[in-house]
Design a protein with these regions (language model features):
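N-terminal secretory signal peptides that target proteins for export/translocation
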Residues: 1-8
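Bacterial N-terminal signal peptides
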Residues: 10-23
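Aromatic (tryptophan-biased) beta-strands that constitute blades/sheets of beta-rich domains
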Residues: 27-69, 102-111, 145-168
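Repeat-blade elements of multi-bladed beta-propeller folds
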Residues: 32-37, 71-91, 114-136, 168-180
Length: 180
């Protein structure tokens, strides 16, 4: 199982690295992939055109990355923003140089149990957001430092806070949200 995950990850990372950085200087503004499905519209489409049916058989792996036994990232869509690849596992957030595969930073996501697959993280305005279980993390994309201004020093218990939220007594419970 670990070998299958490793092979899939290596293949995906190698292909993504070539797709994103093979020769994108003319299209550098479209080389970023900041969220799981590219953008808020979930378009899943890149305008990069360096790889097509005429040259796909010439691809070779440039580098690979082994996250470790504890970090299952088999179903993660890596993000690529400004030459940095971000990978979010069940237990760790990684930042890698997308051209070389060199690890730039890693941060633990250690707030409790994390069941089920991890689908990926999101990048916005110099921040990387990742989740584990019912908790959300925010990191500075350049340094990996937890963002002190987000939640409890970079960590937010989303479900716990949502379940304990008290609406004011004057909240109109009989109004349809669309009419508000």
């Amino acid at each position: 199982m670990k070998n299958q995950v490793s092979i899939r990850l290596n293949s995906t990372l190698g292909l993504l690295s070539m797709l994103m950085f093979g020769s994108v200087s003319a299209q550098s503004d479209t080389a970023n992939w900041p969220s799981q499905n590219l953008n808020i519209e979930n378009s899943r489409y890149s305008t990069l055109d360096q790889i097509d049916t005429s040259n796909v058989d010439q691809l070779t792996m440039l580098w690979s990355f082994e996250p470790g036994l504890r970090d299952d990232i088999a179903q993660v869509t890596p993000l690529v923003v400004d030459g940095v690849m971000y990978l979010h596992s069940r237990a760790t957030m990684y930042a890698l140089d997308a051209t070389t595969g060199e690890e730039l930073w890693r941060r633990s996501l250690d707030s409790g149990p994390a069941n089920g697959p991890v689908r990926g993280s999101t990048y916005a305005e110099g921040r990387v957001y990742a989740y584990r279980g019912a908790d959300l993390y925010a990191f500075d994309a350049a340094t990996g430092a937890a963002l002190a201004s987000f939640g409890d020093s970079g960590f937010l218990k989303v479900v716990a806070q949502g379940l304990h939220h008290q609406y004011p007594d004057t909240y109109p419970t009989d109004i349809d949200p669309i009419t508000i």
